[in-house]
Amino acid sequence: YAVAADAPAAAALAGNLYEFSLTHGYDAVSGGLHDEVTACGDVYRDDRRLWPQTEALKAHVARLQDAGDDAARSRLEVGIESLFRYHLMGPPGGWREHINSDGENFYGSYPASTLYHLASAVGELERISDVR
């Protein structure tokens, strides 16, 4: 949005939120994004839903492409690997929607909205595939 609308204030805010999430939102072991952190940066829920992982991938793409953040490339690779290792496994055509801090699935259903998030992330990754 910030680039399309030529809105530097939005770009600055997005950059601050991105940096906050990098500092406080990630599980160092899995490379996945925690469900919730407080405004002070403390982990409130260390479970991990699938859809925020896809949103994180899209944020890394935006940082790489629009903010010139070359370090976002390695974050993107870690995020993709974490997504496949912890969420895109199990029965063919299925996924692990919500996992605990040990990486165990505890959510039994497969929300259809997850397909939207996966497709959006894949679309962004495909769009920049020539950048990689």
Task: Please tell me what each predicted stretch does.
Residues 1-132:
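Glycan-recognition and catalytic cores of secretory/periplasmic carbohydrate-active enzymes
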